[in-house]
Every structure is written in C-alpha cells, then in structure tokens.
Swiss-Prot record:
Keywords: Disulfide bond, Glycoprotein, Pyrrolidone carboxylic acid, Repeat, Secreted, Signal
Domain of life the protein comes from: Eukaryota
Family named by the database record: Belongs to the semenogelin family.
Short name of one Pfam family: Semenogelin
Subunit structure: Occurs in disulfide-linked complexes.
Name used for this protein in its record: Semenogelin-1
Gene designation: SEMG1
Start-end of Basic and acidic residues biased regions: 50-80, 107-118, 241-253, 283-300, 308-317, 341-358, 366-375, 399-416, 424-433, 457-474, 481-491, 515-532, 539-549
Entry-annotated residues carrying Pyrrolidone carboxylic acid: 24
Organism: Saguinus oedipus (Cotton-top tamarin)
Region spans: Disordered: 24-118, 133-160, 172-585
Function according to Swiss-Prot or TrEMBL: Predominant protein in semen. It participates in the formation of a gel matrix entrapping the accessory gland secretions and ejaculated spermatozoa. Fragments of semenogelin and/or fragments of the related proteins may contribute to the activation of progressive sperm movements as the gel-forming proteins are fragmented by KLK3/PSA.
Amino acid sequence: MKPIIFLVLSLLLILEKQAAVMGQKGGSKGRLPSESSQFPHGQKGQQYCARKDKQHAESKRSVSIEHTYHVDIPDHDQTRTSKQYDLNAQNKRIKSEKHAAGSQEPFNHKQEGREHGKSKGDFHVLIIHHKRGHAPHGTQNPSQDQGNSTSGKGISSQDSNTKERLLALGLGKEQDSVSGTQRNGTQGGSQSSPVLQTEDPVHNKKPETQNSLQNKGSSPNVNETKQKHSSKVQSPLCSAQEDRLQHGSKDVFSKNQNQTRNPNQDQEHGQKAHNRSCQCSSTEERRPNHGEKGIQKDASKGSTSNQTEDKMHDKSQKQVTTPSQEDGHRANKTSSQSSGTEERRPNHGEKGIQKDASKGSTSNQTEDKMHDKSQKQVTTPSQEDGHRANKTSSQSSGTEERRPNHGEKGIQKDASKGSTSNQTEDKMHDKSQKQVTTPSQEDGHRANKTSSQSSGTEERRPNHGEKGIQKDASKGSTSNKTEDKMHDKSQKQVTTPSQEDGHRANKTSSQSSGTEERRPNHGEKGIQKDASKGSSSNKTEDEKHDKSQKQVTTPSQDQQSGQDADEEEDLLSHYQKDRHQHRSYGGLDIVIVEHEADDDDRLTHHDNNQNSIFT
C-alpha cells in the first residue's frame, strides 16, 4: 500500500502544480470524476465534449467510473480524440473503430460507456488516449473528444486518473491501478511521470485503435497489474508468490504459512557464548498391531535424540533405531551430550511410554512389550550435566528395563548428577527371574580438561514373551542401537551407532560408546566390541530358547581423561549364571562370559575405581 499512497500523493502534487499553470494559461481546471468538465467558452467542440462527459458520468455513476475527455485549448482547430476500450466488449470497440462519421460516434461512446457501467461491477478499465496532431479528415468531429495540449491535458487527465485510482483503492475492486495517464505513459514511454506525455499524431482511426490496443497489450490483464502491485505491498518478502497472485490467488500469508510449516524441523542454536549447546529434538512414534499404544517424548536441551520404533506382527519383531546426534559446541571447554532412545511395542493391547525431558542432556527410554502376556514397561532416566566454564563434565546414563511374561513389572529410574547409574531389571517367563545390575559411573573431570562419557545399555529378549531393550545415552557422543527380534528361534539385532561430537572447546575429549548385540539360537554366543575413543566396551549376551533364559549386559563406562573404570555385571538365572568380568587393558574392556549351572548365586565385585554391587 505504501507505493500506491506515495504515487497518489505525488500525482496530487503534480496536479496541483499543473492546475496553477492551467489557471494562468487558460483558466481551465482539472475535473473531478463526479463533476462535469469545465472548459473555457468560445471554442469549438467543447459543447460536444461536455455533453459526452455528462453522458458518461450518468452511465457510470453505478460503478463510480467516469471517462474524461479533454479539449485542447491552444489548438482548438485540431481534433483530439480520446477513446475507451473495454476488454470485455471488443465488439463495441470494433464498432467505434469502424464508425468514422461524427454523427454515429457519440452513440457508440454512449453504448460503450453504458456497457462499461454494466460489465464493470467488478472489473473495469479506463484508458484515455490523448492524441496530438491534425485530424485526418481535416474537420472537427463533434462526436470525437477534443484533446488538449500537454498543459491542459496533463492536469485534467491526471486529476481524473488520480480520483479513479482513489476510487479503485476505496472500493476494493479489481480495477487497473495504472490508470489512463499511465497508459499514456506507456505510449509515451513514461509511467512514473504521467504529466508530460508524448502524444502521437492521429492520422486515422485505425492507428489510434492499434495504439490503444498496444496500451492494452502492455497490461493485458488488469487483475495482473493490480495484483502485482498489491503483491509487492502486501507480501514484500514473498516474491515467489507473485505468479500465484497474477493468477488470482489472494490468500498470500496462509499459503506461505502452509508452505513453510514443517513439523519435523530440527532446531539448531548457534553458540556464540560459553556453555551453550545445540538443541535438536525429533520425536518418532510407532504403534504396532492390535490396539497397542506407544508414546515417545523427547525434549532434549543441549543434545539431540532420534527415536525410532519398529514393531512387527506376530513373533518376528524388528527395531532399528538410528539416532544421529550432533552437538556443535563452540564455547570454550564445553561438552556435548547425545542420547539414543529405542522403543518397541508388540501385539495385543500392550502399552509403552517413553518420556525424555533432559536439561543440558538427553535421556533415552526404551520400552519393550511382548506378545502373549501383555507386559508393561516404563523407563524414566533423567540426566543432568553440570557444565561450567573451563570445567565441564559430561554424564551419560543408560537405563535398561526388562519385563518378562505373566504381568511382571520392572521399573528403572536413573537420575545421575555428576554420575550415572544403570539399572537393569530382567524378568523371565517360566521361572520369573529377576536380575538387577546397578553399576555406578563416576566421571573424573578436571579443569580445562573435560571428558565426555557415554553409557550404552543393551538388552535383548528372545521369543516367548521375552523383551529386549537397548539404550544408549552418551554425552559427547551418539550411539545408535537397533533391536531386532525374530520369529521363533532366530533373533537378529543390528546396531548402527552414528556418533558425531563437535567439541570446539579448548581441551575437550569426546568419547562414544556404540553397543551392539546379537543373539543367535540355542545357546550361541554373541560378542560385541565397541572401540570408543579412550575406552571400549565388549558385551556378550547368551540367550537360549527352551529354557527362556535372559541375559542382560549393562556395561557402564567410567571415562576420565586418563582413567578407565571397570564394571562387572552378574546375571543370575534359574538355569544359568552368567558372570561378566570386565578387565581394563589400556582403555579396552573385555567381557568374558562364563556359563555355570548354579542356581541363585550372588556375587559382589569391587572394582579399582568403583564399588559396583550386582544383586
């Protein structure tokens, strides 16, 4: 609207100046659209023009459009013609072109003006052509308008055009904002300054008609001209939608919002100051067969978690979690945290809920519910990371829960501030076994030397109501875990850890733990090795079919910038006792799985740096 207002104001100023000039020259004034044209007396053809203007004013009062015709005061012996051509009434235009006689011309103009009044309920074009030169027939045609010279024509035509432009803006109709003076500017080569316009000599009727049609050809669609002008005013930032506005679409902002709206956008906050973290939250949720409910919520502040749930139908379940997490820390001495959350929900009305609301870190919750027994599992690990300037500590907590058949419940909560505790509950099918592993993780953080720790927790549950949960909540790294459960006796697990840790601080170390598990059939052994930066964890889980045994390996990594912590997990079952011994060799944790036939044994192991009690 601002360009239109400026243009109107500039035209009004120009009209006032030329009105003063015309008052000095001939005393003629610019005529308003509602007024009749005022011309000085004693000149030929003025009565006809005034009469014709009155007739147009009467025929166009319904739509407030008038056609102005002006008399050239200095050159009153020369004929000046001004014609109007309607886009919707081309046949009338042809008639007006064909009739050269002056007696029939006013009737054509009357009919043309009346049909403009009828056809312009929503659309009208006003073209005023000021022709200069001698008449081709050498006679003054009373049916033709008497044009005027540059001074008189400029005032009256611009005044009427300005008024019509104001009417077009006030009525809100789709009319040509570029009025007759700008059409004349199109002929003369000037639209911005319609005061001084080059006038073509009228040799006959057809050149005038062609010139007027060329003026139409310059803007063939009045709606396009109006909408182009309005699109620049209403949506200056949306230049891509001028094509739509040219084709009649007026809802600019709603279409912009519909186009630019993306519900799965990742939000990245660039860090310019110290101790800032990138945030990127993407929540994925999958619901399997038979009315199951799976809810995952991930609101991570300072980290990124991607959750993927894949649920299969009867007995073959496959889950692929590929969280790609990027922490761009540009502050001095910052740590990045990432968490991978996996969730699986089987058949028959089971419910699984994951919530992850971590401030400065990301906690991953994994719920796995199985087929026949309709188990329920809720994991809520909360992670807190104390990041300070020049002294930052990164903490990661992996929470694992396992719930077997027969309506058993296992709840794990991990709220570690400065440390991470991993709890694993394993409940079995027939014998209803329970196994809790609680390794406590300690992070030795030194000033100007920060280390990021990641704990990968993996669980797998075989067939017959078993559950497998993998969790990887790594700070300063990202681990992607994939749980794959197969049909009867064959289980498959694919772990794809993509870990990206952008530490741009002075003296920061990022460590990533990728956990992979694979469980074959009938007492086979699967060994996982993870060579992380500064440490590696190897996990071995052995699951068997007939006895419905379950083995949970929860290695928690204590990573100091020069220290490796040992963790041991003892998994007790009624049929087997799995003894995991972690031996640290310069940053490598080797897991040796020994299967014994003892029942209900408990073992307490004291590490060098930790006291991990496994019950």
